[in-house]
From Swiss-Prot:
One of its GO terms (biological process) is mismatch repair. This is DNA mismatch repair protein MutS. This protein is involved in the repair of mismatches in DNA. It is possible that it carries out the mismatch recognition step. This protein has a weak ATPase activity. ATP binds at residues 607-614. GO terms for molecular function: ATP binding; ATP-dependent DNA damage sensor activity; damaged DNA binding; mismatched DNA binding. It comes from Caldicellulosiruptor saccharolyticus (strain ATCC 43494 / DSM 8903 / Tp8T 6331). Belongs to the DNA mismatch repair MutS family. InterPro entries: DNA_mismatch_repair_MutS, DNA_mismatch_repair_MutS-lik_N, DNA_mismatch_repair_MutS/MSH, DNA_mismatch_repair_MutS_C, DNA_mismatch_repair_MutS_clamp, DNA_mismatch_repair_MutS_core, DNA_mismatch_repair_MutS_N, DNA_mismatch_repair_MutS_sf. Pfam families: MutS_I, MutS_II, MutS_III, MutS_IV, MutS_V. GO terms for cellular component: cytosol. The keyword Nucleotide-binding applies. It comes from the Bacteria. Keywords: ATP-binding, DNA damage, DNA repair, DNA-binding, Nucleotide-binding.
Length: 863
């Protein structure tokens, strides 16, 4: 049996190293896939499946994609959950002895995929290291150079919440931690990799070599080190370009759990699952991708540091009050490319001349941007002015060296500007003159042969050639040497053309090689300044985010909140930032809010469905979040005492995937709130208890409300919307509980939602009115009204009967000693009463008869 061909032997050897990947094997201008990889790729990419002789008298299934368009195919495979290994030719095929040397240069996974189209959003990869009961989390976006790490102590739910903020596309965990693997799989759709963790000493070695990070403990180092080890192993590059490392403590930021983030629609809407109609969609008016990502980060992690919040607010206020300067700054920002992502391309050596020109255009506006920043006085803007590096040396290098019309490819020539390098100029002159000679030669041959459409062309296989169409074959002279036959033409060469070709090719080849060499030198010089470039990118992102906040404040009539360390939340004429944009400013009804930790701790809000209870409660939470981000808020006036956590229990939904019912999901969320809320927290409860029977639900809602209102237990600021009108009694029983309702106006059988929150409880849910608004047939509504009337009468009867029964028993007890001889008879009468099926009048008559007998008995006793 024949052995595999040498090339296929090489392929099989390399494939053994990446069994879990689809191997893109470079063959000339294509990436080829073989065997099972080819079968999978042809199906997933919808490309033709062919075959290639591989030895052993067999043909291997094969498919391929052009190397210059491979990125889009790789993206499709990554999106479908595959890993892709890139195997490149690492020596010149012309110089190779035997099979061209090839090596795996990169393994691409969901978390290490870099979008060449530069999507605005981050693409994080996360590593979770569990040490005892604690969780060390590290997040990296290799495309922007950002790295964040934190330690979650003994709280798996908090770990889940923190990971959700970054929405990582890939999560790494130890291959030994089966329990953690199940938790991750249950909560995220991310690509989960179980890897063999390296020891802590190796982690520290890697960190020292790659990052120069200090002041992290062993638990965090285990997470950081294993993530770095994975990246180095798959990307085959150094990660010392990652300069933006931040270790943070979760408790140093406003904590918002996953459920609340979803309920408040912070980053995406619940229905469309998109940025549109979310708070992020309103706040993100950034002109750069860097600013957009920073706004999202600020939204995921609002501050609790009053000083830093007010630094942002003061900067936004100054921009707000200087609209002409704001407009000029935003105009400059619009011309800035994604410098963070351009920076990462230096590490991968994938940056091209077009990228450098984009960097140059971005740097070009920096001197003017710095000049405008010098006009401001607020501390944060002055700090940004001082830190903004205009990178004039980098600009000068690119401007003097890179041709404005440079191609994307690095080995096509035309990259280096005239006048930058003498040798380039000399070779370019030869090349240009030779081309002129070719034009002259073409004209000469047309005249000699009489073939008017004769033309000279070039391809990599045959070099320069003379092409003659079929109709002119009879005019071809004998000195023409045939090289290639086409369907409608023949291609020829002459000795004179060969001589010209040698001159041109040698000059052009040397020129291409020299230009590439010079480009690499320029690239490396700029890469040596990468830390300065990244710091400038960070400054630009902050400036952009602050300008976005100022602009939306102007457009949407927001006001600067007073943020302080107290416990009071006072909002005058507050609005929901998203809803008011959807329905129009003039159509939105604003509302006041007053919450504190004393007499306004818990606001019970009643009113019909669709009246606006949920919108009102959400808007309070969103205003708090916006204020603690350092953003102006949709209100006439706002005083926000710092909140440490925001919780919400809104809506009812089954968690089918985990087998949890509506009520179980609801109670789990309530339990999480009761366990983690503090007096500094803000809690939103919407219809607690409606997922079970009326009495169970009422009992639970009542107990929950008592618990959160109790200062000795939680005492948190709480908004509690309910249809259980019985809960309004708590205003009289618990200090700090206040009743509010959404006001409505009745007009006959119809109601008008006034959307106004007013003092006092609501004694009707207006369910039938809402059903009428929803279009329920009138026949059904009339029947519903009949049933409601009977139920209400029955309820009155039950209450009255209960009251009468108590009165009868009291009367009986008082008189029993006077008619002991009649007591059995009277007790029997009472026991035989069908209380629920008698009217109040009948009950009063019976009571009168019993009373009459007792009086008679007393009289007999006294005789």
């Amino acid at each position: 049996m024949q052995e595999l061909t040498p090339m296929m032997q090489q392929y099989m050897e390399i494939k053994q190293r990446v069994k879990d990947c689809i191997l893109f094997f470079r063959l000339g201008d294509f990436y080829e896939m073989f065997f099972d990889d080819a079968i999978i790729a042809s199906k997933e990419l919808e490309i033709a499946l062919t075959a290639r002789d591989c030895g052993n008298n067999e043909k291997a299934p094969m498919c391929g994609v052009p190397y210059h368009s491979a990125h889009s195919y790789i993206a499709k495979l990554i999106e479908k959950g595959y890993k892709v290994a890139i195997c490149e030719q690492v020596e010149d095929p012309k110089l190779a002895k035997g099979v061209v040397k090839r090596e795996i240069t990169r393994i691409i996974t969901p978390g290490t995929f870099i979008d060449e189209n530069f999507s605005k959003a981050n693409n994080f990869i996360c590593c979770v290291a569990r040490v005892e009961s604690d969780f060390a989390l590290t997040f990296v976006d290799i495309s922007t150079g950002e790295m964040y790490a934190c330690l979650i102590e003994n709280d798996i739910q908090k770990m889940i919440n923190e990971i959700s903020k970054y929405a990582p596309s890939e999560i790494l965990i130890s291959h030994l931690d089966n329990e953690l693997y199940e938790v991750i799989r249950e909560n995220y759709n991310s690509f989960v990799q179980r890897i063999e963790f390296i020891e802590i000493d190796r982690c520290y070695d890697l960190i020292d070599k790659q990052m120069q990070i200090t002041n992290i403990n062993d638990k965090v180092a285990l997470s950081v080190g294993n993530l770095l080890n994975y990246l180095v192993d798959t990307q085959k590059i150094s990660f010392n370009y990652i300069k933006k490392f931040e270790f943070y403590r979760v408790q140093n930021y406003l904590q918002i759990d996953l459920s609340t983030k979803r309920n408040l629609e912070l980053t995406e809407s619940i229905i469309a699952r998109s940025k549109k109609n979310s708070l992020f969609g309103i706040l993100d008016q950034a002109k750069t991708s860097m600013g957009s990502r920073l706004i999202k980060k600020w939204l995921e992690r609002p501050l609790i540091d009053v000083v830093e919040i007010n630094r942002r607010l003061d900067a936004v206020e100054e921009l707000y009050n200087n609209f002409p300067l704001l407009m000029q700054i935003e105009g400059l920002l619009e011309g800035i490319y994604d410098i963070e992502r351009l920076s990462s391309k230096f590490a991968y050596k994938s940056i091209n001349a077009k990228d450098l020109l984009s960097l140059k255009k971005s740097i070009e506006v920096l001197p003017r941007l710095k000049e405008l920043l010098g006009e401001f006085k607020s501390p944060l803007l002055k700090e940004l002015y001082n830190e903004l590096d205009t990178l004039e040396d980098v600009y000068s290098l690119i401007d003097s060296s890179i041709n404005e019309d440079a191609p994307v490819g690095l080995k096509e020539g035309g990259i280096i500007k005239d006048g930058f390098n003498d040798h380039v100029d000399r070779l370019r002159n030869i090349s240009k003159n030779s081309k002129e000679l070719l034009i002259q030669y073409e004209e000469k041959e047309r005249n000699l042969t009489g073939i008017k459409n004769l033309k000279i062309g070039y391809n990599k296989v045959f070099g320069y050639y003379i092409e003659v169409t079929k109709s002119n074959y009879s005019l071809v002279p004998e000195r023409y040497i045939r090289k290639q036959t086409l369907a409608n033409a023949e291609r020829y060469v002459t000795e004179e053309l060969k001589k010209l070709e040698d001159e041109i090719i040698n000059a052009e080849q040397k020129l291409v090689e020299l230009e590439y060499e010079l480009f690499c030198q320029i690239r490396d010089k700029i890469e040596s300044q990468i830390e300065r470039i990244q710091k400038t990118a960070s400054c630009i992102a902050i400036i952009d985010a602050l300008c976005s906040f100022a602009h939306i404040a102007i457009d949407n009539r927001y006001t600067k909140p007073i943020v302080y360390l107290g416990d009071r939340i006072y909002i005058k004429n507050g609005r929901h930032p998203v809803v008011e944009k959807m329905i129009g400013y003039s159509n939105f009804v604003p509302n006041d809010t007053e919450l504190d930790n004393d007499q306004n701790r818990v606001l019970i809000i009643t009113g019909p469905n669709m009246a606006g209870k949920s919108t009102y409660m959400r808007q309070v939470a969103l205003i708090v979040i916006m204020a603690q981000m350092g953003c102006f808020v949709p209100a006439e006036e706002a005083q926000i005492g710092i909140v440490d956590k925001i919780f919400s229990r809104i809506g009812a939904s089954d968690d089918i995937s985990s087998g949890q019912s509506t009520f179980m999901v609801e109670m789990s969320e309530v339990a999480n709130i009761l366990k983690n809320a503090t007096p500094k927290s803000l809690i939103i409860f919407d219809e607690v208890g409606r997922g079970t029977s009326t009495y169970d639900g009422l009992s639970i809602a009542w107990a929950v409300l008592e618990f959160v209102a109790d200062k000795s237990k939680i005492g948190a600021k709480t908004l509690f919307a309910t249809h259980y009108h019985e809960l309004t009694e708590l205003e009289e029983k618990i200090s700090g509980v206040k009743n509010y309702r959404v006001d409505v106006k009745e007009e006959g059988k119809n109601i008008i939602f006034l959307r106004k929150i007013v003092r006092g409880g609501c004694d009707s849910s207006y369910g039938i009115h809402v059903a009428r608004l929803a279009g329920i047939p009138e026949e059904v509504l009339q029947r519903a009204e009949q049933i409601l009337k009977k139920l209400e009468e029955a309820d009155i009867n039950r209450k009255e009967a209960k009251r009468l029964r108590k009165e009868i028993k009291r009367e009986f007890t008082e008189q029993i000693e006077f008619f002991s001889y009649k007591k059995d008879e009277i007790i029997e009468k009472i026991e035989n009463l069908d209380i629920l099926n008698i009217t109040p009048i009948q009950a009063l008559n019976i009571l009168s008869e019993l009373k009459h007998e007792i009086i008679k008995a007393k009289e007999r006793q006294l005789l």
